[in-house]
């Protein structure tokens, strides 16, 4: 593994311009010492200038493990270092303790404890904001830990920014190029930019705020859509792959046994092949609707499959193949020109939860597009008996997949370029 991350990049950046850091709080339990939060602000030597991660808990039987964070003490110590520090990290800790203790709590007691902890955090945040000058400060609220299964099944972590130059609305960054979605890699560059520190040895980009009405509703909507696509992706592609393999075996059997393709079995096989060819388009078109539950996802698939099956019965196979192929190419072209808005929530698109890619063409989509581009070239060659138009289409396909502001997929570019050279 050649990946060598720079440990302590944010701390080094801040220390390089003479500013100081601080860290308060912990997620300790009565059995384990958990103090990983300070890793965010430490420098490459593991140093933080101020803080208290040791003597910061109170005994309280109403809280998990009988302990809770002493927010009054944190506020008091923050006041004493306010003028000396430029970056302060606070690990509230209590929600982490609740999460690890939740197996021992009934649902009712769990929610009671959670509401109690959230109330404490809310009061603490309010007290902090009251002591901050908004025009000289930035407050970042984030929950980078795994979600609690009893609350929701979201695998995306929330992030809230407050302070100078931050509009009411949603967040984005050039790392993701998606409204409402940022990467955890963007946190350090955002802090460094605000403090006018160098952004060095950091992989992300500064977060930007976008003024947008109905921000909460929008975030909830895309969170649900992203979650459903992520949950159904592997199972959908697995089933699709298995059906394709079974269909191929069926086709081999039909041709080996020299079964007449004009009888009922042959016609069924042809329609099945046509439907399988249309499945990626069905997955794309169904994602255009507000699919926020697995039930809606399955219903939309059934509707589109029924619709395509009806079309396949009404028109000849060759005409359907031409129509579907042209529709595919048009959809992919429009999708790239519209920054991926058509395929954004499709199971064939990239998954922001995984974080391997946020824009451009993912490998699944490139695989489909490679087949479509070569088929289009073949159809045009058959229609016009001339290589010029097919070659132009293939070269356009290479640009679509390879351009950094469009497909941005190196492997896909090489594959389509190879197909183009072979065609020529």
Feature annotation, model-predicted:
Residues 111, 115-118, 174-181, 271, ...:
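Hydrophobic alpha-helical scaffolding
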Residues 220-353, 363-383:
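Core alpha-helical transmembrane segments of integral membrane proteins
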Residues 284, 398-403, 421:
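Alpha-helical transmembrane segments of multipass membrane proteins
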Residues 287-293, 401-411:
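Membrane-interface helix caps and helix-loop-helix hairpins in membrane proteins
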Residues 319-322, 384-399:
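Short hydrophobic alpha-helices at membrane interfaces in multi-pass membrane enzymes
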Residues 139, 393-397, 413-424:
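Hydrophobic alpha-helical segments of polytopic membrane proteins
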Residues 1-232:
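Soluble extramembrane regions of membrane proteins in the secretory/endomembrane system
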Residues 52, 350-358:
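Amphipathic, glycine/alanine/valine-rich membrane-attaching segments
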């Amino acid at each position: 593994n050649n990946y060598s991350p720079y440990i302590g990049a944010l701390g080094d950046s801040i220390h390089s311009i003479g500013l100081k850091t601080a860290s308060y709080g912990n997620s300790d339990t009565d059995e384990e010492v958990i103090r990983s939060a300070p890793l965010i602000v430490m420098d490459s030597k593991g140093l933080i200038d101020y803080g208290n991660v040791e003597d910061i808990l109170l005994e309280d039987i109403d809280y998990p493990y009988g302990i809770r964070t002493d927010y009054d003490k944190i506020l008091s110590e923050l006041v004493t270092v306010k003028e000396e520090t430029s970056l302060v990290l606070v690990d509230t800790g209590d929600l982490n303790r609740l999460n690890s203790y939740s197996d021992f709590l009934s649902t009712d007691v769990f929610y009671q404890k959670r509401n109690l902890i959230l109330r404490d955090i809310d009061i603490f945040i309010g007290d902090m904001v009251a002591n901050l000058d908004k025009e000289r400060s930035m407050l970042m609220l984030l929950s980078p830990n795994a979600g609690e299964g009893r609350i929701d099944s979201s695998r995306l972590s929330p992030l809230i920014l407050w302070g100078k130059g931050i509009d009411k609305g949603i967040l984005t960054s050039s790392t993701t190029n998606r409204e409402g979605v940022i990467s955890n890699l963007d946190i350090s560059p955002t802090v460094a930019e605000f403090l006018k520190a160098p952004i060095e040895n950091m992989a992300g980009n500064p977060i930007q705020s976008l003024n947008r009405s109905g921000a909460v509703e929008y975030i909830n909507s895309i969170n649900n859509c992203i979650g459903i696509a992520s949950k159904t992706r592997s199972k959908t592609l697995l089933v699709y792959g298995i059906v394709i393999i079974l269909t191929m075996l069926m086709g081999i059997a039909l041709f080996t046994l020299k079964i007449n393709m004009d009888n009922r079995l042959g016609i069924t096989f042809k329609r099945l092949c046509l439907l399988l060819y249309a499945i990626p388009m069905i997955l794309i078109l169904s994602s255009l609707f507000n699919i926020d539950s697995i039930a809606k996802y399955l219903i939309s698939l059934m509707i589109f499959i029924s619709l395509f099956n009806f079309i396949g019965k009404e028109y000849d196979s060759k005409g359907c193949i031409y129509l579907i192929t042209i529709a595919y190419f048009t959809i992919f072209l429009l999708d790239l020109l519209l920054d991926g808005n058509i395929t954004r929530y499709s199971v064939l698109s990239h998954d922001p939860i995984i974080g391997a890619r946020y824009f451009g063409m993912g490998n699944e989509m490139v695989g489909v597009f490679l087949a479509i581009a070569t088929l289009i070239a073949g159809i045009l060659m058959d229609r016009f008996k001339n290589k010029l138009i097919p070659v132009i289409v293939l070269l356009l396909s290479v640009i679509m997949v390879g351009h950094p502001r469009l497909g941005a997929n190196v492997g896909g570019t090489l594959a389509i370029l190879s197909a183009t050279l072979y065609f020529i």
